[in-house]
From Swiss-Prot:
Its main location: host cell. It comes from Camelpox virus (strain CMS). Keywords: Disulfide bond, Host cytoplasm. It comes from the Viruses. Virion protein with no enzymatic activity. Belongs to the Cu-Zn superoxide dismutase family. GO terms for cellular component: host cell cytoplasm. Gene3D superfamilies: Superoxide dismutase, copper/zinc binding domain. This is Cu-Zn superoxide dismutase-like protein. Disulfide bonds join 52-102. GO terms for biological process: superoxide metabolic process. One of its GO terms (molecular function) is metal ion binding.
Amino acid sequence: MAVCIIDHDNIRGVIYFEPVHGKDKVLGSVIGLKSGTYNLIIHRYGDISRGCDSIGSPEIFIGNIFVNRYGVAYVYLDTDVNISTIIGKALSISKNNQRLACGVIGISYINEKIIHFLTINENGV
């Protein structure tokens, strides 16, 4: 399981990469964006010393997230990404090729409460 904490200006979120019910998923939530569609992209480096300017070139497009009118995006995407290959890289939230927020992907312990909560969100139970 891997996790990325996003905390840039007023944009905050937590994104998990983990297997759920035998499939690899990207799960989490983001707040602070204007309503609309945004891209989740993994970048070459996990260097955020200069914010999102130092994370290098885009490597993997994860998918689109949709922010509602309240500025909240609930993330639940399928992915083919091998989690072990993205540890230490950066994840960005971007729109129109502009990086709006980013964070470093790190190893996370498995927290059954989080997994249960995120699974509940997907199934609506």
